[in-house]
């Protein structure tokens, strides 16, 4: 009984001490989550900026080929002097020379070729990376300029080639026909012929560009070559109706019915090799497409210029004699000459396409190309000639030659432009 009462007192004291300790302890703080400070990040581009251009314009791998018909025009061949004149009056002295009142210019300072037909074929490969390889080759048909003039049986009208006569210091003319009985009538004919052929090839890498909606933009870099071949010839034929009216190499012993003539030939060959850069913009819808291309090439033009001339005499019996030198081509300027010049070749093109099927497209477009520093045959003519070096001139051999005509490489520019109609097939 006493032990039970003692244990009850001990338990009561222990509970009282525990309660007091709990009341004196500091209040418990509420739990809280501590967050780490935010890490700064590069802000994203505004949505309106990202919508302007996608950084790359990647397309699936594809191959395409195209073929175009070309309808082009080129810059006519310039000449350093009018080549053929005529006159119907006998009061001018000398007749048919430049600056005389009765002189008519029959072939002026530019020879036109008209419209050229041609072709252009191309091949391209679009890589999955967005790069593309493109190549094309074009060729224009060879076209000619032709001029013919002849007098009647009385030598009317006067037909001539004008030149500046360095022996006497005046504008003069070599007569091909003459109807003046006082100086000797003779008949004659002249022919002027010129020809041109143009072709070229290029290989480009098109870089992966930017896009916006239906538009895509690419850069171009590559290599191109061009070839321009041209010629000019002047041929005369004079018939002596009576003894001694015409001379050959200073001799008037030309019987009636004999034929004398002059031949001048000028040819040029231009080869351009250079690197090029450019850009291309394209627009594509489900049916229509538009491509605009601009590029410029820098490089060297290698030139070969050939000058030759001769005169001939054909006797009534058929015996022939040929001597060097015509009119504008004499031993003083004849020969084969080589030159290399720096050239720039810019080109611009516009093409509109219509999708015929999922793989076939019809195209129509326009191209303009310019080429600086080229040699053209007519520019190589020196219009200053000493009359005493012309084998068919009456004054042949009367004074020592003075080196005229002389050869000087004369540069010109060239352009070609026109329309193209074609088809493009994509594999």
Predicted ranges, named:
Residues 1-7:
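Bacterial N-terminal signal peptides that target proteins for export
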Residues 7-16:
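Bacterial N-terminal signal peptides
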Residues 10, 22-23:
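Viral structural modules
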Residues 17-21:
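Sec/Tat signal peptide C-region and signal peptidase I cleavage site
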Residues 23-80, 103-151, 171-237, 257-299, ...:
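Outer-membrane beta-barrel transmembrane strands
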Residues 83-104, 155-182, 235-265, 306-336, ...:
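Solvent-exposed loop segments that connect transmembrane elements
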Residues 299-305:
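Short acidic/glycine-rich loop or secondary-structure boundary segments that cap or lie
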């Amino acid at each position: 009984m006493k032990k039970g009462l003692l244990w009850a007192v001990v338990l009561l004291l222990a509970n009282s001490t525990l309660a007091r300790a709990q009341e004196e302890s500091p209040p418990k703080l509420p739990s809280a989550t501590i967050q780490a400070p935010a890490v700064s990040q590069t802000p994203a581009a505004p949505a309106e900026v990202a919508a302007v251009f996608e950084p790359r314009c990647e397309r699936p791998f594809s191959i395409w080929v195209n073929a175009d018909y070309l309808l082009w025009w080129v810059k006519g061949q310039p000449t350093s002097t009018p080549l053929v004149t005529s006159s119907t009056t006998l009061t001018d002295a000398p007749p048919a020379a430049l600056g005389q009142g009765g002189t008519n210019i029959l072939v002026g300072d530019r020879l036109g070729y008209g419209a050229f037909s041609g072709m252009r074929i191309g091949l391209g490969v679009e890589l999955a990376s967005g790069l593309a390889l493109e190549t094309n080759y074009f060729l224009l048909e060879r076209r000619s300029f032709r001029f013919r003039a002849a007098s009647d049986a009385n030598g009317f009208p006067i037909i001539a080639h004008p030149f500046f006569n360095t022996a006497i210091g005046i504008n003069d003319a070599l007569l091909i026909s003459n109807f003046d009985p006082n100086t000797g009538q003779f008949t004659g004919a002249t022919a002027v012929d010129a020809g041109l052929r143009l072709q070229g090839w290029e290989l480009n890498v098109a870089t992966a560009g930017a896009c916006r909606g239906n538009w895509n933009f690419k850069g171009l870099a590559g290599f191109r070559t061009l070839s321009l071949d041209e010629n000019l010839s002047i041929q005369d034929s004079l018939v002596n109706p009576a003894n001694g009216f015409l001379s050959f190499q200073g001799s008037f012993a030309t019987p009636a019915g004999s034929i004398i003539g002059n031949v001048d030939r000028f040819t040029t060959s231009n080869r351009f090799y250079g690197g090029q850069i450019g850009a291309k913009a394209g627009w594509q819808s489900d049916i229509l497409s538009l491509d605009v291309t601009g590029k410029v090439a820098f490089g060297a033009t290698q030139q070969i210029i050939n000058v030759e001339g001769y005169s001939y005499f054909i006797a009534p019996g058929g015996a022939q004699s040929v001597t060097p030198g015509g009119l504008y081509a004499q031993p003083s300027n004849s020969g084969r000459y080589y030159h290399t010049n720096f050239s720039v070749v810019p080109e611009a093109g516009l093409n509109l396409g219509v999708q015929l099927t999922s793989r076939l497209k019809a195209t129509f477009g326009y191209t303009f190309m310019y080429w600086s520093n080229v040699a053209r045959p007519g520019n190589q003519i020196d219009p200053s000639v000493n009359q005493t070096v012309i084998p068919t001139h009456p004054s042949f051999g009367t004074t020592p030659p003075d080196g005229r005509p002389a050869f000087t490489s004369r540069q010109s520019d060239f352009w070609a432009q026109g329309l193209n109609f074609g088809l493009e097939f994509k594999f």
